[in-house]
Amino acid sequence: MSDAGHTGVNQLGGVFVNGRPLPDATRQRIVDLAHKGCRPCDISRLLQVSNGCVSKILCRYYESGTIRPRAIGGSKPRVATSDVVEKIEDYKRDQPSIFAWEIRDKLLADNICNNETIPSVSSINRVLRNLAAKKEQVTMQTELYDRIRIVDNFPYNSSWYGQWPIPMNGAVGLNPFVPAPLIEPKTEGEFEKDEDQKPPTEPEDDAAARMRLKRKLQRNRTSFTQVQIESLEKEFERTHYPDVFARERLAQKIQLPEARIQVWFSNRRAKWRREEKMRNKRSSGTMDSSLSNGTPTPTPGSVTGSNMTNPIGSPASTPNRFPSNNSANLPTTNFVPQTSQMYAGLSQPAMDPYSFGIANGFSMAPYPQVTDFQPHHMFQGRSPYDFPYPRMPTNGHGFQQSMSPATTAVGDIPTLSSGMSLPVSAVLNSIDPSLTHSQMHELSDLTQEHYWRPQ
């Protein structure tokens, strides 16, 4: 094995040469170890030969009794020659229920082939399939010709068929139809003969020994007791991959070989993966059905956000800043309108824009309650062309200026049913008393452009 001219090392540490078969000495050792009862996996580890190579050599030895490698390169010689195919057809005609391995034994017994030229069972089955397909094709053609002959001899009354110059029977020249013979039922002895599928006893002792060895190495399925299954399941709950010490301890406890325990854990892990996949599929299906029914699964963020924030336009989130008709004064709130973008150069009052009359000594008459009136509705436009409300009138019915805003009467201010009017000087003094005359003039123009008036 330690050839200096090797071209690689396999997964077991053994060297090999590409294009060269395994040495005959190694092949003989593989067969000897198999006769002693070693498993192919143990032979592979012991001789540092790949498992596939060991299995292939043993399979060829069981079938043909030889350990010599076949020819490398080129195509294999054709073993299903015409003589062999004719002999297979004769066997099948004489005994229609014959098996392929029986045909193979007959070819060897009749000295049609030897161990080197005998076709395999798959080759014989392929020949039988080809013969059956050819026979079916011939049968279909015969049935077609019989139908044509019957139609041609049918007495038609039509003048077109009577004018046909050449009769079909003379043109085709078919033989008269012969019915197929009836199939006689088989006797009891014939049934027993067909059901006997055991191969005949081979004359060679080495062939019989090979078959016995092959049956001995093919073990049956291991059956576990309830105590063994409980111990294995308990260990599987502890870990899916037990180490060698855990396997040895478990083997001594439940009286099973370590190799069987290792195989059981491998199969149990595969079963657990299948069950896990089914559980994930069922959970995803439940989630999809809940989403289709309109009941999404709540998340902590969504619950917290829904409890903390409300939409701006909802009645529950907006306090009622207008009292009922039986109250005479306007209540005060700490609401600050978002007017910093519109009036960036002005200081913002920390008061409600509709409650500054009370801060300056104003009083209003009772007015009807407005339920859907929000301050942000009045600041949606930056220019008078964007603003949805009409511009401020220029007559004296609008804003009435007064030099003494603290003593304004209620009769000077119309109620909200016809519009709200407040003195401009009171508005300016309430915003910032330290403004100059020019700034107050600009603010007065701005107030005329955007006055606060609900319709």
UniProtKB/Swiss-Prot annotation:
Its main location: nucleus. CDD domains: homeodomain, PAX. The keyword Nucleus applies. Residues 83-131 are annotated as: RED subdomain. Residues 5-131, 217-276 bind DNA. Disruption phenotype: RNAi-mediated knockdown causes defects in gonadal distal tip cell migration. RNAi-mediated knockdown reduces expression of the integrin alpha pat-2 in gonadal DTCs in about 70% of individuals and in 90% on a vab-3 mutant background. RNAi-mediated knockdown increases expression of the integrin alpha ina-1 in gonadal DTCs in hermaphrodites. RNAi-mediated knockdown induces generation of additional dopaminergic neurons. BAG sensory neuron-specific RNAi-mediated knockdown reduces expression of receptor-type guanylyl cyclase gcy-9. Residues 289-306 have a biased composition (Low complexity). Keywords: Cytoplasm, Developmental protein, DNA-binding, Homeobox, Nucleus, Paired box, Transcription, Transcription regulation. Changing residue 52 to R: In wz25; abnormal BAG sensory neuron fate and inappropriate expression of the transcription factor ets-5 in non-BAG cells. Transmembrane segments: none annotated. GO terms for cellular component: cytoplasm; nucleus. Changing residue 52 to E: In mw105; defects in gonadal distal tip cell migration in larval development. About 50% of individuals have reduced expression of the integrin alpha pat-2. Hermaphrodites express integrin alpha ina-1 abnormally, beyond the egg-laying stage. It is found in: Nucleus. Pfam families: Homeodomain, PAX. It comes from the Eukaryota. Residues 274-329 are annotated as: Disordered. Residues 307-329 have a biased composition (Polar residues). Changing residue 120 to N: In ns157; defects in AWC, AFD and ADF axon guidance. Shorter CEP dendrites. Almost abolishes expression of hlh-17 and ptr-10 in dorsal CEPsh glia, whereas nearly half of animals express both these genes in ventral CEPsh glia. InterPro entries: HD, Homeobox_CS, Homeodomain-like_sf, PAIRED_DNA-bd_dom, Paired_dom, PAX_fam, WH-like_DNA-bd_sf. Transcription factor that binds a motif with the core sequence 5'-GCGTA-3' in the promoter of various genes. During development, required for cell fate specification probably by promoting or repressing expression of genes involved in specific cell fate. Involved in head epidermal morphogenesis. Involved in gonadal distal tip cell (DTC) migration, during which modulates expression of the integrin alpha genes, pat-2 and ina-1. Regulates ventral and dorsal cephalic sheath (CEPsh) glia differentiation and expression of transcription factor hlh-17 in CEPsh glia. Belongs to the paired homeobox family. This is Paired box protein 6 homolog.
